[in-house]
Curated annotation (Swiss-Prot):
One of its GO terms (biological process) is Notch signaling pathway. It comes from Homo sapiens (Human). Residues 52-64 have a biased composition (Gly residues). This is Mastermind-like protein 3. It is found in: Nucleus speckle.
């Protein structure tokens, strides 16, 4: 069983989910289905208990006393699921039939009401006596003047009842009362009452009838069994709708209850049953087969009390909010329900426990769901389900999703209820509903024995649902009182929190996670979370009160609850749980005093609260823990939260950050602070993390690609991505000065970061190039010329070096532009010139995109590691190395990194290790030629390149602005003289200021590498250079240049922006000089072959790159259909690139 316990639990859990979904879709689901007369309900009922039992007991329990085999369990589950499906289909059919019947009955009722109304009006107008109509209506006789209004009101009520029955269908009405989850129970309990209401005399006996297994719960289900089922089929939306409708539902329920089920006893039960019998709404229609006469009786009864009904309905519809109506009906129904139902005796402890659990769950249940999402779900999936079976499982499921889905009323209600008594009441139903779920979950979890015991005992089909409803009603009332008290306490606490907001905000955020972590324990330990809640605000700095803090946290976190709850589900919670719990345990107990002494008392440290108030407050709260711990833990937590939030929100936050990149760093910080509560706190410290950003932004911004644009600002980048590491530090310090200092530091760091990023990016690019080279070699080994052309593309990647040129913001903007332009130009060039064709040959689509991305700084590396190395093999591998080595002045260092990455390329390896240029030549040549060969390309395509490519992309995109233009300008040059564009002279001029001077050496080698990479293509690329020296020396010198450090010069040219850097960006900008054998060789002023070989790969790379100075010829040759075009065509043909 141990082996199968988990599968059984999982399978059962899945079946539970399926069953719960099916059952919920089946109308009230669990209990309703179980209550259904069909034998299939028995299967679902056993299904849920079995599922719960199996899940709870770890397998043997439930449907299968013993799980001998996983297949057996699965088969049983399948059978049960099939049975549920069949039952669902049957219910749907019955529902449709019943719906038609109901429509007919409703029409009849409407017609009869209308006729009666006309008759009454005629009598009133003629005789002015409404008494004659219903001699049994003394009140109406006395109220002949108001009979018209009464009739009209009755018509209105019946219409509303019809609409609501049609729209919400009574089964959901009851569900709504107990909560979204209660749909499982409420339909059942409704059906129970409906059954009882079948003989409405029994309604007086409802307490005794409640235990009825709802043998007739489907008596209405028979008419409308599928109504709840179908509605539960749409159970979640139905519940939501019903929740929205619940306000009306009481009204509906009143007339509905009065419509049929209460017909006989309606006069007797009017006040009670009206409130109690929202459950009976379905019976209206069900019994309404004889509804005309019954409705006449009902209406006579209603007419008897017509004034009261009018008042009630008018008040309900007009004066009383739907929430209040729900509360009234729920409370009254619950009150009567509790006394009426003798079984609540067992439920009463549960309701109390559940009330306590619920009261905390109202605060903590959300915490259960949020932090306890693992816990709450296990609890929901555990014995609670087994005991409560479907009823519990569904509420727990509904309540559990409520946490992930803040929109779900239970969670929101639970969360909000502590916040606002009205919401607490309005949710009052919903929180009790989740309360039921929590009763089931927390009660089942914490009170598992009592919850499962009493619940299991009442678990008789209807009784458990009704009991749950009763418990829900009691709990709702209690929860409302608790929530009101808690809310009052929370209000006080909130005031205290407002005072302590800065501390509490962080505390709450952390504790929201922590309490979410602890909350599952909290509810049982502190049934009344409110009491502790009061204490929490008293000493918000007292983190030990994680549970208490959560309640206040919930209202303050109301806005953040979704995020926090979502974050609770996110890995952050784990980190936050880890960080926060230990912080709460150790730092709270130890740091409470210290915190109070440290920063809790020194709120002035949070003098930046104006902007950082939220941020600073959490830092202050963190200081409550420890001056350092808050920073470290906050940074960790905030980083985690920010990273998670960013990861969660990355699509929007990067967008936000993209524009932020254009914003001033301070504005970015403010925006980030404002936009992100959690982020804001770390943002408070954002200035300090700038260093961390420098380090992390390389990784973090990479992860959040667009983040890089904001990262270069440092503050923005930090806030967005890297800030999580350091953001916490600024909190207590004057952020204005710190921010300035941080900006300065960040700027200085940004350079370092860029270097680091380039190193990382180069590594990533090398990995990507290697990976791509491997893939491309495999694809292109049959297409050597394409490989050559692909290397030509590598000059595109060379532009990636430009990433460093522009400001991160500019680069970010340039990235998109350069990416688009590079994609367009690169694709045009790919079509026009073999360059792009080369990229496609390696990764036809990738190179086309890579050309575009090469400007972006990513695709060129990732997409065409081989061609990119070929073009500027360094651009992918060497460019990274060159860029970074240029920054660090060590091309070999990165080349060595690439060397191991490109070790597969024997030449490239030696070259790489020997020289970054060798790397480029190797990657370019080996990637190009070996890519043809496959081993080198394989070595080059290593996955390391892509990460750097990505990271480089961010940076390249930054540099893309300058090289954007030249890449755009040079892109056509690239395609024709692709190396020219890759010189990125335009972009590298921007980078020229950046530490890329060493790249000056590389550009020549890069041009060579381009030639090498494009042995044939380089000739076309650098027809002159190739014609000159590279053509002959390309193959031979490729090996030599590959083995030579010359490749570094090739890299410099390969990253023409690098020579553009060192020397004339204009020349680099020039497509012909793009590879700067001319421009860079001007810098190095060597013959293309000489420069290449002299510069590190003078022969192989230099030869080809000398062609780059001849980029015009190369462009002409390529444009004129040189081998580049042919390669492009072949690549396009191979890869189907347009």
């Amino acid at each position: 069983m141990g082996d199968f316990a988990a599968p059984a639990a999982a399978a059962n859990g899945s079946s539970i989910c399926i069953n719960s979904s099916l059952n919920s879709s089946l109308g009230g689901a669990g209990i309703g289905v179980n209550n259904t007369p069909n034998s299939t309900p028995a299967a679902p009922s056993s299904n849920h208990p079995a599922a719960g039992g199996c899940g709870g007991s770890g397998g043997p329990g439930g449907g299968s006393a013993a799980v001998p085999k996983h297949s057996t369990v699965v088969e049983r589950l399948r059978q049960r699921i099939e049975g549920c499906r069949r039952h669902h289909v049957n219910c749907e059919n019955r529902y449709q039939q019943a719906q038609v019947e109901q429509l007919e009955l409703e029409r009849r009722d409407t017609v009869s009401l209308y006729q009666r109304t006309l008759e009454q009006r005629a009598k009133k107008s003629g005789a002015g006596t409404g008494k004659q109509q219903h001699p049994s209506k003394p009140q109406q006789d006395a109220e002949a003047a108001s009979a018209e209004q009464r009739n009209h009101t009755l018509i209105m009520l019946q219409e509303t009842v019809k609409r609501k029955l049609e729209g919400a269908r009574s089964p959901l009405n009851g569900d709504q009362q107990n909560g979204a989850c209660d749909g499982n129970f409420s339909p059942t309990s409704k059906r129970i009452r409906k059954d009882i209401s079948a003989g409405m005399e029994a309604i007086n006996n409802l307490p005794s009838n409640m235990p009825l297994p709802s043998a007739s719960p489907l008596h209405q289900l028979d008419l409308k069994p599928s109504l709840p089922l179908q509605n539960s089929g749409t159970h979640t939306p139905g519940l939501l709708e019903d929740l929205s409708k619940n306000g009306r539902l009481p009204e509906i329920k009143l007339p509905v209850n009065g419509c049929s089920d209460l017909e006989d006893s309606f006069t007797i039960l009017q006040s009670k049953d009206l409130k109690q019998e929202p459950l009976d709404d379905p019976t209206c229609i069900d019994t309404s087969e004889t509804s005309l006469s019954n409705q006449n009786k009902l209406f006579s009864d209603i007419n008897l009390n017509d004034q009261e009904w009018q008042e009630l309905i008018d008040e309900l519809a007009n004066t009383v909010p739907e929430d209040d109506i729900q509360d009234l009906f729920n409370e009254d129904f619950e009150e009567k329900k509790e006394p009426e139902f003798s079984q609540p005796a067992t439920e009463t402890p549960l309701s109390q426990e559940s009330a306590s659990v619920k009261s905390d769950p109202s605060h903590s249940p959300f915490a259960h769901v949020s932090m306890g999402s693992p816990q709450a779900r296990p609890s929901s999936s555990g014995p609670p389900f087994s005991t409560v079976s479907t009823a519990t499982s569904l509420p727990s499921v509904a309540s559990t999703p409520a946490a992930p889905n803040p929109a779900s009323s239970p969670a929101n209600c639970a969360v909000q209820s502590p916040q606002t008594p009205n919401q607490a009441h309005t949710p009052g139903q919903a929180p009790p509903r989740p309360g039921n779920g929590y009763l089931l979950n927390p009660a089942a979890v914490t009170v598992a024995g009592s919850a499962s015991g009493p619940v299991a005992v009442p678990s008789s089909d209807m009784s458990p649902a009704e009991q749950l409803k009763q418990m829900a009603a009691q709990q709702q009332q209690r929860a409302k009182l608790m929530q009101q008290k808690q809310q009052q306490q929370q209000q006080q606490q909130q005031q205290q929190q407002q005072q302590q907001q800065q501390q509490q905000q962080q505390q709450q955020q952390q504790h929201s996670n922590q309490t979410s972590n602890w909350s599952p324990l909290g509810p049982p330990s502190s049934p009344y979370g409110a009491a502790f809640t009061a204490e929490k605000p008293n000493s918000p700095m007292m983190y030990p009160q994680a549970f208490n803090n959560q309640n206040p946290i919930v209202p303050p976190m109301a806005n953040n609850l979704q995020k926090t709850t979502m974050n609770n589900y996110l890995p952050q919670n784990h980190m936050n749980m880890i960080n926060q719990q230990p912080n709460n345990l150790g730092t709270n107990s130890l740091n409470k005093q210290h915190n109070i002494l440290t920063y809790g008392n020194t709120k002035p440290l949070t003098h930046f609260n104006a902007d950082l108030s939220q941020r600073m407050t959490p830092p202050v709260a963190n200081p409550n823990k420890n001056p350092l711990m808050p920073y470290i833990q906050q940074q960790q937590q905030q980083q985690q939260q920010q990273q998670q939030q960013q990861q969660q929100q990355q699509p929007p936050p990067p967008q936000l950050q993209a524009p932020r990149a254009h914003l001033s760093e301070d504005q970015k910080r403010l925006l980030l602070m404002k936009q992100k509560g959690v982020m804001n706190q770390p943002m408070a410290y954002a200035a300090l993390p700038s260093h961390g950003q420098e380090q992390h932004p390389v990784g973090l911004p990479r992860t959040t690609g667009p983040m890089q644009s904001s990262v270069p600002p440092g503050s923005g980048g930090m806030v967005s991505g890297a800030s999580p590491a350091g953001p916490g530090f600024l909190g207590s310090q004057p952020q204005a000065a710190i921010m300035k200092q941080m900006l300065i530091d960040q700027r200085a760091q940004l350079i370092e970061q860029q270097k680091q990023q380039f190193l990382r990016e180069q590594r990533q690019q090398q990995q990507q190039q290697q990976q791509q080279i491997l893939a491309e070699q495999q694809l292109q080994q049959s297409h050597l010329p394409r490989q050559h052309l692909q290397p030509q593309r590598n000059p595109y990647p060379v532009q990636q070096v430009n990433q460093f040129q522009g400001s991160p913001q500019d680069i970010a903007a340039v990235r998109s532009q350069a990416a688009l332009q590079s994609m367009r130009t690169s694709r045009l060039m790919a079509q026009n010139a073999g360059m792009m064709g080369i990229g496609p040959s390696q990764n036809p689509g990738t190179m086309a995109t890579a050309a575009a991305q090469s400007e972006m700084g990513l695709a060129p590396y990732s997409t065409t590691p081989t061609s990119q190395p070929g073009m500027y093999n360094m651009s992918t591998g060497m460019t990274q190395m060159l860029q970074h080595p240029n920054q660090s002045g060590m091309s070999i260092t990165h080349n060595q990194a690439q060397g191991p990455r490109q070790p597969a390329s024997g030449q490239g390896v030696g070259m790489v290790s020997g020289f970054g240029q060798s790397m480029l030549v190797n990657s370019a040549i080996t990637q190009q030629h070996p890519q043809m060969k496959g081993p080198v390309g394989q070595a080059l395509p290593r996955p390391q390149a892509p990460p750097r490519l990505q990271s480089l992309m961010g940076t390249v995109q930054q540099g893309a602005q300058s090289w954007q233009q030249r890449s755009l300008q040079g892109m056509p040059g690239r395609t024709s003289g692709e190396l020219g564009p890759f010189n990125n002279g335009a972009s590298y001029p921007l980078q020229a200021g950046q530490p890329r001077l060493t790249k000056q050496h590389f550009p020549q080698g890069l041009s060579q590498s381009v030639v090498d990479a494009n042995t044939g293509t380089v000739r076309t690329l650098n027809p002159a250079a190739m014609g000159r020296q590279m053509m002959p020396s390309l193959p031979g010198q490729q090996g030599t240049s590959q083995a030579r450090p010359m490749v570094m010069s090739g890299l410099s040219q390969g990253v023409p922006g690098m020579p553009a850097f060192s020397q004339p960006p204009a020349q680099q900008q020039i497509p012909s000089g793009s590879f700067a054998p001319s421009s860079q060789s001007q810098a190095y002023e060597r013959n293309a072959p000489q420069d290449v070989s002299y510069n590190y790969s003078g022969d192989g790379a230099g030869g080809s790159f000398p062609g780059l100075p001849d980029g015009a010829d190369l462009v002409d040759s390529i444009i004129k259909g040189g081998p580049g075009d042919e390669w492009m065509q072949e690549l396009d043909e191979l890869f189907g690139n347009p």
